[in-house]
């Protein structure tokens, strides 16, 4: 019996890391991105723009068991965030990928929170209503959360670990902030991938 089938929508660095981890556990991995040349050879790649509704709908036949949505803004304005985060999830709903028999994990951002003064945030902290781009991300989250599917949302912040990277290079060169009390909220790419893979594995196990 084959393992679960995962479709990674917008498969960049994080998606590839997650897919490779799950592939070693017997999962079948399909990956959607504009260019498939950089995808791991273990993946079945589909060269599409996931923000193109018709292109995304054309792959409805894949019928995944699980979906990992790793979106990126398609521009710095609000419309770019809507195209990257909100609109594709609406399409996933129309093609049946948000039904109760599918598990969906979305990698979101802590940008959705209202806190801007360095305070602590939790899953229940207030969300911003003043940042239109963050609201567009929230709208994508809401589509997933209101769908029949099981849809955990991972709100990450400050990804690092892709070389060369500014944070790693600053540490290597001994560059420090002039503010000794400055706190940086970051997560390593491998850690985020481990979390996402762990969530998907638990979902597959019925947890």
Located regions from the model:
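Conserved Rossmann-fold cofactor-binding substructure of NAD(P)-dependent oxidoreductases
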Residues: 43-65
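Glycine/proline-rich active-site loop of Rossmann-fold NAD(P)-dependent oxidoreductases
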Residues: 135-138, 147, 159-172, 198-207
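N-terminal Rossmann-fold NAD(P) dinucleotide-binding loop
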Residues: 15-16
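Catalytic helix-loop patch of NAD(P)-dependent Rossmann-fold dehydrogenases
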Residues: 117-154
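Glycine-rich "substrate-gating" loop/helix at the edge of Rossmann-like oxidoreductase active sites
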Residues: 128-131, 157-158, 162, 179-187
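NAD(P)-cofactor binding segment of oxidoreductase domains
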Residues: 59-105, 139
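Substrate-positioning beta->alpha
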Residues: 166-168, 178-205
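Conserved Rossmann-fold NAD(P)-dependent oxidoreductase catalytic core, especially the SDR/UDP-sugar
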Residues: 91-130
